[in-house]
Amino acid sequence: MVVSVGTSLVVQAITAPPAVPQLVIYKERPPLMQVNAKEVARELLTHEQFKCFSFIMGKESAWQDKDNPTSTASGVGQLLDGTYRNLGMKRSSSTVAQTIAALAYIGRKYGAGGPCAAKAFWLKNSYY
């Protein structure tokens, strides 16, 4: 709005009222230890990405919390102790935490290609 006052103009800024925050209702979730690692991955990924990720986890550990007897690799994603450290994470006995760590590793290593790029690499090299 422009108001003329004598020979000068005064501009008044008209601002919208503050936005009312939207109420967001989240699904009720069971405690973390009761959540299935596959379901967490399925919620975080597209259908195609989940299929690729599930292929890798199936090959690495059959989605089980396993320790590799010949290296420091452990968990669903068979990540090395050094990989956990590089991700700023700690080794966990939770398959959900292991799955999130594997997704973080894939995101860092393969970027936008994600789990399907990791699967393509796995098919050529038998590791990701």
Model-derived features with residue positions:
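Solvent-exposed loop/turn segments at secondary-structure junctions
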Residues: 61-64, 83-86, 127
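A short, structured beta-strand-centered segment in the mid-to-C-terminal lobe
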Residues: 90-97
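Acidic/aromatic-lined carbohydrate-recognition and catalytic surfaces
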Residues: 114
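Export/targeting segments at the very N-terminus of extracytoplasmic proteins
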Residues: 21-62
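Short, functionally critical alpha-helical segments immediately adjacent to catalytic or ligand/cofactor-binding
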Residues: 48-63, 99-106, 117-123
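Catalytic cores of secreted/periplasmic lytic hydrolases that degrade extracellular macromolecules
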Residues: 109-111, 121-128
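N-terminal prepro-regions of secreted/extracellular proteins
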Residues: 1-31
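Substrate-binding/active-site groove segments that recognize
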Residues: 70-87
